[in-house]
């Protein structure tokens, strides 16, 4: 057995198909049990519960045992840029989840109830963080992207022949057609 934590964010959908139409049962946790893996199911929108579940999973891995954490949550956004989730779920459903089960909102309520946070602090902090994020974006845009061929590095201890061939084909392709790509945005090879 292996001391590993598998963390599944069960958001209720696989692209546009609800999990209720994908498999019997109410989640994938049972599959872990079938493979002899410890399973912890947790409310994925409860920050403290997720922390405690992860802590418990870590303790299990110290016994050289694998663990599957299934965090039950909801996907608020689209699956990808090619997905329009309004085609298979209504805005009321999404808004209800956002307003009632949003993990950030839920944790904020806990902090406010303890007197550790308030609306004024929240507004000030959001402005500060937004500024820091924009500064980080501007800084990152000035840094060249890693060398395109570096995507083949540090994947395997010894690179398989097929991967070496793919890397060589990409290198050859870029030598021939590199002028058609924004190679100036990448570090030199």
Regions flagged by a language model, labelled:
Residues 2-142:
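Glycine-rich ThDP/TPP pyrophosphate-binding loop and its adjacent helix/strand module
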């Amino acid at each position: 057995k292996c001391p590993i934590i598998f963390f599944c964010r069960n958001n209720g959908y696989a692209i546009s198909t609800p999990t209720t139409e994908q498999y019997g049962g109410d989640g994938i946790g049972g599959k872990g049990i079938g493979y002899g893996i410890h399973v912890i199911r947790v409310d994925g929108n409860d920050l403290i519960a997720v922390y405690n579940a992860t802590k418990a999973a870590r303790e299990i891995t110290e016994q050289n045992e694998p663990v599957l954490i299934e965090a039950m949550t909801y996907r608020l956004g689209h699956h990808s840029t090619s997905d329009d989730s309004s085609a298979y779920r209504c805005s009321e459903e999404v808004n209800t989840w956002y307003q009632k089960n949003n993990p950030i909102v839920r944790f904020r309520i806990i902090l406010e109830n303890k007197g550790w946070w308030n609306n004024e602090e929240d507004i000030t902090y959001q402005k500060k963080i937004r500024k820091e994020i924009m500064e980080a974006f501007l800084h990152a845009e000035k840094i060249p992207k890693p060398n395109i061929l570096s995507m083949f590095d540090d994947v395997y201890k010894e690179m398989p022949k097929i991967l070496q061939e793919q890397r060589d084909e990409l290198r050859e392709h870029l030598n021939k057609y590199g002028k058609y790509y924004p190679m100036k945005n990448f570090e030199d090879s």
